[in-house]
Structure formats: C-alpha cells, structure tokens
UniProtKB/Swiss-Prot annotation:
Sorted UniProt keywords: Cell inner membrane, Cell membrane, Membrane
Membrane topology of the entry: Peripheral membrane protein
UniProt function note: Interacts with the SecY protein in vivo. May bind preferentially to an uncomplexed state of SecY, thus functioning either as a chelating agent for excess SecY in the cell or as a regulatory factor that negatively controls the translocase function.
Major localization class: membrane
Family to which the UniProt record says this protein belongs: Belongs to the Syd family.
Gene: syd
InterPro entries per record: Syd, Syd_sf
Gene3D superfamilies in UniProt: Syd protein
Protein name per Swiss-Prot or TrEMBL: Protein Syd
Transferase keyword on record: no
GO cellular component entries: cytoplasmic side of plasma membrane
C-alpha cells in the first residue's frame, strides 16, 4: 500500500487538538452505526467519542479498477483504506473544509459505489478521471485528485478541475490544520439504507444538482 505519512500525522494532531482545546476526544453523530473508532458509550444526545484506528485488513480498490478497466492512483488505497475514521474538519489557506474518511466497512463499500459513479460521470462528460477526497465549505467545491499525476485540485461537479492546490495528496494534507468544532447533528430527509450522515449528505446533494442540469 502506498504510504501517506501526512495523513497519519494529521490524524494524530487532530486528536491532540481536541484534547488540548476541549479536554476530550472528538465527537461524531454516527446514527448508531458501529465502528472500531468508537471510544466509550454514546452520550445522551446520540454522539460518540471516537479515535481513528488502523484497519486490521486494509481496504483496496481492485474491484473498482476491474469494474471500470482503469488503474487508480495508488494513494487512493492509503487515503481511504488504511484507517477507519470520522470525517476530518480542517482549516487551510484555501478556507475550511472536510476530508472524507470511512467509519466502517459498510461505509467503505458505499464510498466505492460513489467513486464508481463519479468516474463514470467523468467518462460520460469526456473529462479526465479524478477521485474526490473532501469538500470545501465554500459552496459546492469538491477536493479531487487527478488520477494521472496525483495532484490535488478544486473541482465543481460537472466541470473539469479548476484550481491546483498541491502537487501530491501527501503535500496537500501537510498544509492543513485540524479544526476543532462541535459535532453537527444533521436533520436529514429520508434516505436509502446505505446513505450515511455528515459529508455524504453534501456529496449526495452536489450529485443531485449535477444530474438535474
């Protein structure tokens, strides 16, 4: 598996930032989804304390590559397949945002479905393949990796990558600062069973808007 030392360091700093500022680990509204990340019991409001953990069996994207007949940039396995974690909030010179991570194996499989959908849409639009790693808080801006060279860009759904942020995913993550913020309890519309809270709702809305164009 390709290594992303910047992600390992960011996860460590993330936990440390919450302990130093709030004297507690980060909390997440997991909607009663089980995860190896959970620390202790759910609180009275339904949130859980969590800490990122290294997966016993790393997640791989071989099935996605086979389905699409496409070789994916190796960093996708290190970014999504090494840990179980809640989404990660950050501050940066480009603004604040979130990095997508996977909460459990079901979440990982749902992620794969979404990446397949994203890559199929890029092919349909005759655009170069990219895969998403998060979102910026500014409107509908996705953070995506150029699958050809591994660089990180801003991308609007339905458009080509527009603003280059870093030459590599490792470099991009090294430029982020953990953002300490209370957990957000989302009031969501009824969704299929595989839909997940938080950042997934934002991704769903972006793709719904794209398909509606």
């Amino acid at each position: 598996m390709s290594s992303l030392p910047a992600l390992d360091l960011f996860l460590s700093k993330y936990q440390q930032a919450y302990v130093e500022k709030l004297d507690e680990q980060p909390r997440y509204y997991a909607q009663e989804q089980e995860s190896d990340c959970v620390v202790g019991e759910m609180d009275s409001d339904g949130a859980v304390f969590w800490q990122a953990v290294v997966r016993q069996t790393p997640g791989q994207f071989d099935n996605v590559e086979t389905a699409l007949e496409l070789t994916l940039c190796a960093e996708i396995n290190a970014f999504y397949g090494r840990h179980f974690s809640a989404p990660l909030f950050f501050d940066s010179k480009w603004g604040s945002g979130e990095l997508i991570q996977v909460w459990n194996q079901t979440d990982f499989e749902y992620l794969q479905q979404n990446i397949i959908g994203h890559l199929m849409m890029k092919k349909k639009l005759k655009q170069e393949p990219t895969w998403f790693i998060g979102v910026l808080d500014d409107e509908d801006k996705m953070l995506t990796v150029n699958n050809s060279d591994g660089s990180v860009w801003v991308e609007i759904p339905g458009e080509v990558q527009s603003s280059k942020l870093a030459e590599s995913l490792n470099e991009f993550i090294s430029l982020l600062t953990p953002r300490v913020t209370p957990p957000v309890k989302l009031i969501e519309e009824s969704m299929p069973e595989l839909d997940h809270p938080g950042i997934w709702q934002r991704m769903k809305l972006m793709w719904r808007n794209l398909r509606g164009k």
